[in-house]
Amino acid sequence: MQFKKTLVRLLLFLFPFSAAAQTTYLPLGDKANILIERLEIKSKNDSSLNYSKTRPFSRQNIVIAITQLNKRGVNDLKLSKVDQYNLRSLLMNNIEFGADKSIFRSKKTVGKKFYQTPANFYEVHIKDFDLVINPVIQAIISKESNNDQALYLNTRGLTLRGRIANKIGFHAYVTDNQEKDPLYVRDWVNRRKAVPGQGFYKPFKTTGYDYFDARGYFTFNATRYIDVTFGYDRNFIGNGYRSLFLGDGNSNNLFLKMNTRIWKFNYQNLFMELHSAEIPGGDKLLPKKYAAMHHLDVSVTKWLNIGLFEGVIFGRKDHFDFGYLNPIIFYRSIEQQNGSFDNSIVGLDAKANFDRKLQVYGQLSLDEFLLGEITKNRGYWGNKIGIQIGAKYIDAFGISNLDLQIEHNRVRPFTYSHRDSVANYTHYNQPLAHPLGANFKEFIGIARYQPAPKWLSVLKLIYYQQGRDSSARVFGNNIFLPNISPNRVGDYGYSIGSGWKTNVFYASFLLSYEWKENLFIELNAVYRKQDTKTPPLTSANTSVISFGVRWNVGRREFDY
């Protein structure tokens, strides 16, 4: 409660509501994200889309950028018919930010008031007020090879967004969900005491889970260059499929976000209220911890972007440390002033676009390290480092809308952990960055092909090797444990894969058909094989076939 009061007072003091036009944001799983990535690479010499590391994307900024790109013409960007279809769909799904709304009118409405455009169930666009309401439905049934029980995912709810007086934007997403997951996911839930990507949950019919997913936020522009968002949702920092700074696979959290975009700079400050690993039952208040992060993007050229990241996780007795509200100074100096070394992480990222077809990106995450120990190569436990490198190749081999992506992630043991378990880099029993935690190396390959406007196929291959902790010794995989004695035994001999070595191969194939706008019929197949290479040797193979529909909601995946 104290954290919420602090943020509200800060908003009122720093940013009086005399704002200009404002925005809402594309959901992280929105279909338009793929198109935005393609347009960014195709428009190599146009920097209007060159700030794609901090997500979700601003609807207003995307529409403005696309409008600017449209002035260059389809031939200049070499857009395929599928791209043009997706571009029209993006503008229709963000109709409140477009100049001409009449071009998207439905030929046939429902009861004259509903589906005035194909994208939205109900919408109002009048002076000083915009409102868009859509249902959210997902119904998926699955069959697992080594499981006699039927698997399913059932989601019902609604989503809405709007603007008031062209000064305040708002968004809400509320769903009720029941799911029964594959056996490897249930094992994950039993170990973590959390449902992937969700917060509080209840058992449902013995082996299922029941949870309520509610998100929402308010936005406004403090000045022409500063966007402010206050709400309860998720954020993502990076250009990869995964992130070593802040991923989107964890639970929603309360946050205040300030994004400053001017000249060649995009600077984001993010303050979050999180929950520690302890999840008591009943109606008890959950113990809280806090995070303060900032990320600076610099467009060195129109095709090269370099970023700096810094974040700190700190535990206080249910109150926010005001020192961390400073949006500029390095957090380590604040820790020293406070007499407390909290869990601080710094990072560097980069992204470069080449030849309108290729993007190369990467991240370097530094939790702690000693340069002398790195050169000695003795496996010092305190060298807590993560590295990501990847590439995207669009219209691969001259085939329109065939997009390939490869990515490699490696994180050393004990990265993201801390001597104080409250300050580990986690939220609601889930990692804040990469879903595997630490002590792993991972290889990802993704192929997306959209041969026609309504059809999409996605092949995904993931292989990772992880050194897991045993019952007798900790090897730096479990980032929830304090990284001090007796959990950590010794200072040396730790490398990626140390411990109970486990290899996992994951493959999935998705075939998706968009029957109506934002209504997808999908068939998905998953194969997963897990082998332990350290005695006692074990092996577990599973395959899952799924079929279902989803409407105005992103796909739910367990790809690890």
Give short role names for the model-derived ranges.
Residues I36-L39, I226-D233, Y361, S365, ...:
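Active-site-adjacent bridging/hinge elements
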Residues D30, N45-K53, S58-Q60, I64-N305, ...:
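Outer-membrane beta-barrel channel domains
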Residues I36, R215, I444:
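Generic structural marker for isolated residues within well-ordered, non-membrane alpha-helices
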Residues S18, T229-R234, A507-F509:
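An exposure/low-complexity boundary signal
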Residues Y211, L304-V312, K317-Y560:
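Exposed, low-structure sequence patches enriched in small/polar residues
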Residues T23-E40:
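Short N-terminal segments immediately surrounding and downstream of signal-peptide cleavage
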Residues M1-T24:
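Bacterial Sec-dependent N-terminal signal peptides
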